[in-house]
């Protein structure tokens, strides 16, 4: 009896590992866009936090360098928040059956 339960748990763990691998591959393909300055600065990144594009409206290039740097940082942070939210949403279906404490964040 114990052997059968252990084998079932091992099979379940392997299936979960495979599902995680597939989900991580999918997250690497999903892009989110963070913005600041009413869309004048945009950062596009994957849900694996790989920046794909940074777009800066030409009207900002002649302006204050410090302001532009702040807008780029704000757009990047906005993109990171969106990537995290999207990742959590996608992964919640996979982890819904796990006995995890409330607010527990998995490292992906």
From Swiss-Prot:
The annotated region (Disordered) lies at 84-108
| Keywords assigned by UniProt, alphabetized | Cytoplasm, DNA-binding
Its cellular-component GO annotations read: bacterial nucleoid; cytosol
One Pfam entry name: YbaB_DNA_bd
Q: Which domain of life is it from?
A: Bacteria
Asked if the keyword Cytoplasm belongs to this entry, the reply reads yes
Q: Which Gene3D superfamilies match?
A: Nucleoid-associated protein YbaB-like domain (3.30.1310.10)
Q: Where is the composition biased (Pro residues)?
A: 99-108
Q: Which InterPro entries match?
A: YbaB-like_sf, YbaB/EbfC
Q: Which SUPFAM superfamilies match?
A: YbaB-like (SSF82607)
Compartments annotated for it: namely: Cytoplasm, Nucleoid
- Composition bias (Polar residues) maps to 85-95
Which is one GO molecular function term here?
Answer: DNA binding
Sum up the protein's function in the record's words.
Answer: Binds to DNA and alters its conformation. May be involved in regulation of gene expression, nucleoid organization and DNA protection.
Record's subunit section:
Homodimer.
- State the family named in the UniProt similarity comment for this chain: Belongs to the YbaB/EbfC family.
Q: What is this protein called?
A: Nucleoid-associated protein Bmul_1447/BMULJ_01796
């Amino acid at each position: 009896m114990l052997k059968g339960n252990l084998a079932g748990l091992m099979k379940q763990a392997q299936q979960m590992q495979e599902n995680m691998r597939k989900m991580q591959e999918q997250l690497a393909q999903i892009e989110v866009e963070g913005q600041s300055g009413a869309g004048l600065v945009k950062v596009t990144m994957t849900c694996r936090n790989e920046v794909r594009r940074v777009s800066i409206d030409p009207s900002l290039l002649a302006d204050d360098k410090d302001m532009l740097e702040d807008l780029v940082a704000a757009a990047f942070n906005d993109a990171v928040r969106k990537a995290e939210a999207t990742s959590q949403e996608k992964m919640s279906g996979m982890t819904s059956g796990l006995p995890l404490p409330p607010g527990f964040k998995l490292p992906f």
